[in-house]
Amino acid sequence: MCIVLRPSRVHNPEGSTKRALTLKDILNGTFSYKTFFPNWISGQEYLHQSAENNIILYNIETGESYIILSNSTMKSVNASNYGLSPDRQFAYLESDYSKLWRYSYTATYHIYDLRNGEFVKGYELPRPIQYLCWSPVGSKLVYVYQNNIYLKQRPGDPPFQITYNGKENKIFNGIPDWVYEEEMLATKYALWWSPNGKFLAYAEFNDTDIPVIAYSYYGDEQYPRTINIPYPKAGAKNPIVRIFIIDTTYPQHVGPREVPVPAMIASSDYYFSWLTWVNDERICLQWLKRVQNVSVLSICAFREDWQIWDCPKTQEHIEESRTGWAGGFFVSTPVFSYDAISYYKIFSDKDGYKHIHYIKDSVENAIQITSGKWEAINIFRVTQDSLFYSSNEFEGYPGRRNIYRISIGSYPPSKKCVTCHLRKERCQYYTASFSDYAKYYALICYGPGLPISTLHDGRTDQEIKILEENKELENALKNIQLPKEEIKKLEVDEITLWYKMILPPQFDRSKKYPLLIQVYGGPCSQSVRSVFAVNWISYLSSKEGMVIALVDGRGTAFQGDKLLYAVYRKLGVYEVEDQITAVRKFIEMGFIDEKRIAIWGWSYGGYVSSLALASGTGLFKCGIAVAPVSSWEYYASIYTERFMGFPTKDDNLEHYKNSTVMARAEYFRNVDYLLIHGTADDNVHFQNSAQIAKALVNAQVDFQAMWYSDQNHGLSGLSTNHLYTHMTHFLKQCFSSSD
C-alpha cells in the first residue's frame, strides 16, 4: 500500500490558519528576499537605487543624502544600470542589455554630464558595446567594441584605438573568450586599470585554432541559424593568451608593452589566471601550467628607462600541489600590504587546510597567519593595522561563514570574530562589503534566518544602521507552513558527510516519508550551507510531504584537502558512492520509505544523479538529470583537465572512458529516468543528453525526456515554470505509483 503524505493545516496562536507553500509561490518568487550591497564611492559615501529608481548618494558621517541621478534621467534612455565617474562629473547609463554567456552581455551606453544635466554629444559611443568602465581617478573611460579596445581621455573626446586585431570568435581584446569567462576569470572583462589610472593592462585571447562547437538556434525563421563558439574540450587546443600594458597618459607615443610569461610556465601550454595591480609601478600576474598543479605568481616592475615591464625570476613565487590541483576552484589571489612588497594569500598548509599566509620574500618562508582544522575562505581587506577575512571555523560547521578581524599592527596578532555573536540564531552565513580603507563596512547575512544587511563602523565594529531586514517577507511568511531544516553529519569509515535535511512541517519520526536527494557534488562545491531559501524543494516538503536531503561528500570544499582532492583524476566515483552511503544511513533513521526514494541534480548534479540511478543498488525508484555532463571528453578543457588530467593513453584516458553515463545504459532499466536539456546550452552542450538518449535507445531502455528549444544552461523565462511543473508531476507520479 502506498501512502502519500500531506501536511495538515495547523492553527497558530493568532487564530489564523497557516497554509502550505504552493508551486505558484515558488514560480512567482513570492517569498524571495532582498539584500543591500552599498556601491561605495569613498571611505564614507555610497550610492544606492531607491524604490522609485532614483540613484541616491548617502554620506554616513553627515547623514545627508541627495539624488545624483533622477529616475526621469534613467528612464529617458531606458537605463537599467549606471556608473559614476570617480570625479563625479559624469555617469554612464546602460540600456539595451543583451545577455551573451554567464557573465558577458552587450549594451548601449549614454554619457550624462552631471554638471549641466545633459547627455554628452559628439563622439558618441558606438553600439553595442561589450564592456565599458571608468578609470579609478578622473573621468577617462575605456570600452571594448567588436573585440577591440578604445580609450577616451574625456567623455566628449574622440576615442583612441588601442588594439586593431580584434575579430569575432578569433581574437578577443579586453574581454575573455568563452572558456576563460566561464572557467578561469569568472568575469565579463579582461582589462585592469592601475590604481591611479596611469596604466591599463589587458589580455588578448587568440582562438584562431580552437575547435568550434556549433548548434542550431531555431527562432521563428524558416531556417534555423547556427551558433558557433570556439570551445576547447578536454585535450583540445587551447586559446593563446598574452598580457599587454599601455600608458594611457600618452598612448599614441608609446604603444602597448607585452608582459613576459615566466620561463617555467612558457615552456609548455599554460593559462593566465589573474592580474593584481600592486601600485602604479608594480603589477602581479598569476600563471598556471595546463595540468594546473603548478601556479606561478610573478611580480613585475615598470622600467621607465627602457619602457618595459621587468619580471625578475627572484620575484616568482611558486605554489604546487602534490595531491591534487593548485588552489580550490580557482587559485587564490594575493592581497598586498601597504609596503607594496609583501602580501597575504590563502593556500594549503602542511596539514592540508587552506589558510592565510604572509609572504615577504618567498612562499617557502611564508608565515602562517591562521591555522586549524577549518578553512579561511576569503580575504576581504588589508589595512595598515587590520586584516578582515571570512572562514568556517566557528563551532566546527563547514557550511557557515563568519567575518574575522586580525590586528596585524601588534605582535602577536590578535583575532576577533566580528559576526559570531551577532543575531546568532538568525545569522550564521555572512559576507561583507568594505568602503575605502575599511572605514565602514556592510555585513550581509544570508541565513539561516531571514537575510539582513547592516552598516558598521570599521574602527569599532559597532552597528550603525539596518540597511535591509526583509520585514515584508517576514510578515508574508507568518501564514506559511515552512518545512524544518536540520544540518548534521554522518561519520562513515573516517569520512565525514555533512548533510542538510528538510522535513515537512508536521514531521513525525514514527511515520514513513518519501525521500528526494538533491545533489550537485562537483569538485570544490558546497551544498550544505546555513542559508535561507524558499524554493522548489521547500514546496515539495511543505506541500507534498517529502523529506529532502543534500549531502556534501568527497570532492566538496572547505573541509580540507583530503576530502577535496579525493576525487582527483577519478570523477564520477566517490561523489556517487557518498550519496548512496548517505541514503542507506537515512533509511536506518527509520522515517524514510525505502520504496519511495528519488534523486535529482542539475549540470554536475545531473551527472551524479544519472550515475547514482545507474549504480545498480536498487535504492532509487526514479530520478531526474537536468543538463547533465555525460562524458568528460565533451566538457571544457580548463575545468575538466583541472580535475581529470588529459584524455590520452599515457595519462587518464581509461577513466575518461569508464566514467561516462552511456557506459551504464543497461542499468537504467529498473528506474524511472527523466532527462532534461536546453538545445542552446553553450556550457554543457546538448550533445551530452543526445548521447545518453542514443545509448538508452540502443539498449532498449524506456525513459522520459524533455528538450527546451533555444534555451541555455539556465533554462530561464517560461521554460523555468514548465520545467518545475513537469518535474513536480514526475516526482508525484513516481511516489504515488505502486511497484
Residue ranges of each PLM-predicted region?
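Beta-propeller folds
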Residues: 1-440, 446-451, 528-529
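Serine-hydrolase catalytic core recognition
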Residues: 211-212, 272-274, 288, 417-739
